[in-house]
Amino acid sequence: MADSVSLWLPAAVSVAGAVSGFAVWSRPVVLKVWVLAASLASFALLLMFPGAATGPSVVMLLPVAAFLSLLGQPAHEDNRAAWILTLLLLGLGLSLLAAHDGLGLILLALLLIVMVALLYRYRALSVSHLWQGIGMYGFGVVCAVVALTAPAPVSMVAVLAVCAILLPLAPLHGGYIAALAGLPGNLPAFLACLLPVLGLHTLTAALPRLPGDALGALPALGLVGAAYGALKALAQSRVRALLAYANLSFFSMLWWYVATVRTVPPQAVLYLAATGLATNGLLLSWYAIRARYGDMDLRAIRGLAHPMPRFAVLFALLILAALGLPPFGVFAGFMGLLLTPGLPLSGALAVIVLAWLAASWYLLDLLQRLLFGGHRPDLRYEDLRRTEFAALLAIVLILIVMGLAPTRVFQPGAPIAPAQVAGGLAWNR
């Protein structure tokens, strides 16, 4: 009971903070302070209550990612809706992690419905995969209903499809791409952490009960997704779409690993958490550019290293973290995956290495395009503001701590009751 309360209470605080935020809707500065306080309170409650995680588990990542994504936003009225939605999604995500029995699947369906509504509401901002994303999340709602009503093994295959939508795996990745490439404000940065965490949580719970045929097909899908995501990222000229496809490639590697070893060890959780947080930082960095100059094509802006030195240093560090270089968390997680005793590599290793080399190409190319080259005389350059700098610096420091911390502290689902991990969201009939 204490384990559930330790998540339900922070979830309730997040939702209450979102609802009460409408009382100060007309004052953006006050509203920003309010949502920051609500996300910080959720994090504090996870630490204070018995049954909460005592170490840097993946559950703790959610309020931290929400807080930092909110902190990096300017106090402008155009960002208010995204702030409120961040708290609502945080509350929904924590509720899903705490839920047992069929309630977990109901909350999953609710989350997917919210994603459909958000993509449709902000369809004018989307530049790619809008209807594919709406259709994919709608398909996820159908799968959640099937998982609630159908017998095994059909229900477990439906749950697996929902996992592949949240933790992106080709060919069910369209919703994730659309969310990161088309939603406003800090929402893409927060969702880059939230959706994969919920997907891995659901997969961890369902893994022992998945049909053998479905589980046997996942390693091949993971390798195909890693290669496909890398090739698509190479072809992108817009930053958010590039980062979304990069994440598809990185998370497909995680799918390959989990399906091969048929468990979710701490190094897999570390890899997911660090990858999501690095993407969070890169998306916040790009938002700082968009807030100044609009949603530009990569070819339209360059040469930021000299006029924006604080941005340049932090952006370069985040690129190195996302590439999996030491001492950042992605490196520790990725090396932990590859060095697992008894892991069959053979031909799969070649695909993983090629996908990682492709990541080195397109991420370093992104770094080179933005930071180096000639200045545009028609642009007024402005370096990071204090809140933007603080948010990005905190992300870099957390990634370093994740890389240096013992891997064992990243136990999957640390604050969740053991019975929930064994029985999943407990779709027992």
Place the predicted regions along the sequence by residue:
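Alpha-helical transmembrane segments of multi-pass membrane proteins predominantly involved
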Residues: M1-R429
